[in-house]
Curated annotation (Swiss-Prot):
It comes from Nostoc punctiforme (strain ATCC 29133 / PCC 73102). A motif ('HIGH' region) lies at residues 126-136. It catalyses: tRNA(Arg) + L-arginine + ATP = L-arginyl-tRNA(Arg) + AMP + diphosphate. It is found in: Cytoplasm. CDD domains: Anticodon_Ia_Arg, ArgRS_core. This is Arginine--tRNA ligase. Monomer. GO terms for biological process: arginyl-tRNA aminoacylation. Pfam families: Arg_tRNA_synt_N (PF03485), DALR_1 (PF05746), tRNA-synt_1d (PF00750). Its EC number is 6.1.1.19. It comes from the Bacteria. The keyword Nucleotide-binding applies. Belongs to the class-I aminoacyl-tRNA synthetase family. GO terms for cellular component: cytoplasm.
Length: 584
């Protein structure tokens, strides 16, 4: 609900009490945005819901409310329509005043959270000794956008990268490298990430078929857990090599994270099992220690347990996740803990959340949220793969997007007979390519699968990053052409006369509502939809209204609308992790 809607809601609530008495305090006036401009800007539907309770016709109830309703500073006189709708149309003078106010506000009228909280956002989380692939794309950019929005709202956000840096895979890899390439375990940078991945695959194949090697690998895990100096040194080298490769991608995507991998929680795992045992939740089942859960059954309908300690005494993901959750509550003091992973892990989160609640580890004021997302599909509608059927490397995907953007820009420059430096072309291609990939993902409802298409995401028309970057650049083109410094435009300059000015003005004032919605529901696509609609409304205004050639005071007013649109686009896109360009 935006600031204007909030004001109207308060006035309607007061009118309800004035008309029908204190018993109606707190009744929701059911105020919604009008579905059609002919009904005004907002519509209150409360009269219809009260008809039975009051024993009156809805139109009579609406009339009684309107008689007590004081919205003269905000709206034209309210109108009663149909069976009893109260239609409210915002005054032009009110819109002008609101825009003049936000012109001087760096936050563009978006209030910070009234009660800032400490929030953890767990996202990206690649595995050591494996390359980041297209599956990491969604978690990384959705998590980053959520973190940016929460930070903008004033929350204390800890961005956590729960990397897979512990477990059996390291025993396999270290054991294999001791045989075939021991220098990799003692020398920094002996391997690049491609070599590491190749060796990991060979180690896995060997582990799956060679029982003697399995035992050797397990012994390496035992040595690692015991802190044996040579094994620990080898592990650190392998982690550091992967970490450097991850950082290349994070810098390309402008992602900031605090790494706190699985190994961080290793000392806490035995305590998790002990405490679950003390609380009476643990049951031994076929040698493993488990917690049986409500609402989870296997195919035979039998209760499904969550294993927290395997029959061989080892721990698993669930144990680590329980340890990390308890640490985030007790040590980080987080009040909302958000996990951004694929939808396929939904059951896992529901299970270990339930165990933590049963154990009494979740205070009433702590909220746990799993933010699930769908798959990235190829244009054939199947899971996105390379032509050879391999998983697409994230580095390759991003490089290809920049390459496509570079080729598109070169073609456009030739058509326009424009000369630009290679430095300009490379920078624009980088920004457009990376932005296109991010926006194509974020503009989808995260719970849905989406089809990955370079051609669609780089299109200058439609709901794409290039379209909005172009609108932003167009506005700065106006300032260059007119030699205008937007920062020096006068205050109280907005005068709304044309219908496209009014439509743009109303939309500019909805930013606070959109950001508040994303803050609560963690759906960045709502911000994308808003920015796309805003861009369209600006283009309609641009096509219908003269700007630089207009007479004063209309000229300055329209330049203020240009400035507010550009600032809103820049702010909104920055919350999606997207950089803007003043020239394209």
């Amino acid at each position: 609900m935006n600031a204007t809607q909030e004001k109207l809601k308060v006035q309607l609530e007061q009118a309800l009490v004035a008309a029908f008495g204190a018993d109606f305090a707190g009744v929701d006036p059911i105020l919604v945005s009008a579905s059609n401009p002919k009904f005004g800007d907002y519509q209150a539907n409360v009269a219809l819901s009260l008809s039975k309770k009051l024993g009156k016709q809805p139109r009579a109830i609406a009339g009684a409310i309107v008689e007590k309703l004081d919205v003269s500073e905000i709206c034209e006189p309210p109108e009663i329509a149909g069976p009893g709708f109260i239609n409210l149309k915002l005054k032009t003078a009110y819109l002008e005043a609101q825009l003049n106010d936000i012109q001087a506000d760096p936050r563009l009228g978006v209030p910070a959270a009234k009660t800032p909280k400490r929030e953890n956002v767990d996202f990206s989380s690649p595995n050591i000794a494996k390359e980041m692939h297209v599956g990491h794309l969604r978690s990384t950019i959705i998590g980053d956008s959520i973190a940016r929005i929460l930070e903008f709202q004033g929350h204390d956000v800890l961005r956590l990268n729960h990397v897979g840096d512990w477990g059996t895979q390291f025993g396999m890899l270290i054991a294999y490298l001791r045989e075939v390439y021991p220098d990799a375990l003692t020398t920094a940078n002996a391997l690049d990430i491609g070599d590491l991945v190749s060796f990991y695959r060979k180690a896995k194949q060997r582990f799956d078929t060679d029982t003697a090697f399995q035992e050797t690998a397990r012994q390496e895990v035992v040595r690692l857990q015991a802190g044996a100096e040579d094994t620990l040194h080898a592990w650190k080298l392998l982690c550091e090599q992967s970490r450097r490769e991850f950082q290349v991608i994070y810098e390309l995507l402008d992602i900031k994270l605090t790494e706190r991998g699985e190994s961080f929680y290793n000392p806490l795992l035995s305590g998790i099992v002990e405490d679950l045992e003390k609380s009476g939740l643990l049951v031994e089942n076929q040698g493993a220690k488990c917690v049986f859960l409500e609402g989870f059954t296997n195919r035979e309908g039998e209760p499904l347990p969550l294993i927290v300690q395997k029959s061989d005494g080892g721990y698993n993901y669930a144990t680590t996740d329980l340890a990390s959750l308890r640490y985030r509550i007790q040590q980080d003091q987080a009040k909302r803990i958000i996990y951004v992973t694929d939808a396929g892990q939904g059951n896992h989160f529901a299970q270990f959340f339930q165990v933590a609640r049963k154990a009494g580890w979740i205070p009433d004021d702590v909220e746990l949220v799993h933010v699930p997302f769908g798959l990235v599909l190829g244009e054939d509608g199947k899971k996105f793969k390379t032509r050879s059927g391999d998983t697409v490397r994230l580095r390759d995907l991003l490089d290809e997007a920049v390459s496509h953007a570079h080729a598109d820009l070169k073609t456009r420059l030739q058509k326009e007979e424009r000369q630009e430096t290679e430095e300009f072309i490379n920078e624009v291609a980088r920004v457009v390519g990376i932005s296109a990939v991010k926006y194509a993902d974020l503009s989808q409802n995260r719970t849905s699968n989406y089809i990955f298409s370079y051609d669609k995401m780089l299109d200058l028309k439609g709901n794409t990053a290039p379209y909005m970057l172009y609108v932003y650049a167009r506005i700065h083109g106006i300032s260059r052409k007119g030699d205008i410094n937007f920062k020096e435009l006068g205050n109280n300059a907005v005068l709304l006369q044309h219908e496209t000015e009014l439509a743009l003005a109303k939309y500019l004032l909805q930013l606070d509502e959109v950001i508040s919605s994303v803050e609560q529901d963690l759906l960045p696509n709502r911000l994308c939809e808003y920015l796309f609609e805003l861009s369209q409304k600006f283009n309609q205004f641009y096509d219908r209204c003269s700007i630089l050639q207009a007479e004063e005071p209309q000229r300055t007013s329209r330049l203020v609308l240009c400035d507010l649109t550009a600032r809103t686009l820049k702010l909104g896109l920055s919350l999606l992790g997207i950089q803007v360009l003043e020239r394209m």
